[in-house]
Amino acid sequence: MSRRFRGFLPVVVDVETGGFDAGRHALLEIAAIPLELDDAGQLVLGTSAHAHVVPAEGTQIDPQSLEVTGIDIHHPFRLAKPEHEALEHIFAAVRAAVRRHNCQRAILVGHNAHFDLGFVNAAVARSGHKRNPFHPFSVFDTVTLAGVAYGQTVLARAVQAAGFHWDPAQAHSALYDTEQTARLFCRIANAWPAPSPQG
């Protein structure tokens, strides 16, 4: 894997949030799936990590965002973690995968990836977390990839164009969206031959 992406391990991430402004709105849910290579050299989904997040002090939540995501921040079974603890839960799994593949660091894969990375970076800064495994600005964005591969930029339509089922009832769950984005990325990336070691 370390040779496939120049020492970067692709890790698919989705966040659910209290709005669109990473500096102002709360991180509410995060999921991550490091990718693996199977025996045939094809990218496949690894083991997921997932956490609900307690809105950090001083952050805001737009009620319209909760209508879209369906998140009930007061649900008794939400079992949300404080932001620093949630990040560490995700980052520990990512760091372990980076080490296992002898990679230098993780690169975030996402649908509108800079949105997800922006919220991750804002949460890192806010919580004082010192061990962020992700590249600070480089990403693989499935909006661009799906637009080129299938002419589709909306996640649901891109996933269906790639030949997968999309369940609207599960959409806007960070874990479900991460799984679907990961399948989409793998389908597109696996259609290309692996680069030569010199490439």
Each predicted region: which residue ranges?
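Conserved non-catalytic scaffold segment of RNase H-like nuclease domains
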Residues: 2-111, 162
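Acidic active-site catalytic centers that drive phospho-/nucleotidyl reactions
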Residues: 14-16, 116, 141, 177
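Short, glycine/acidic-enriched loop or turn micro-motifs at the edges of active sites
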Residues: 17-19, 144, 180
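Conserved protein kinase catalytic core
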Residues: 20-22, 147, 183
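Active-site-proximal helix-loop-helix substrate-binding element of RNase H-like nuclease domains
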Residues: 53-76, 142-178
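Acidic, Mg2+-coordinating catalytic module of metal-dependent nucleases/exonucleases
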Residues: 107-114, 118-119, 123-124, 156-199
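Substrate-recognition/cap helix-loop segment adjacent to the acidic, metal-dependent catalytic center
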Residues: 117-137
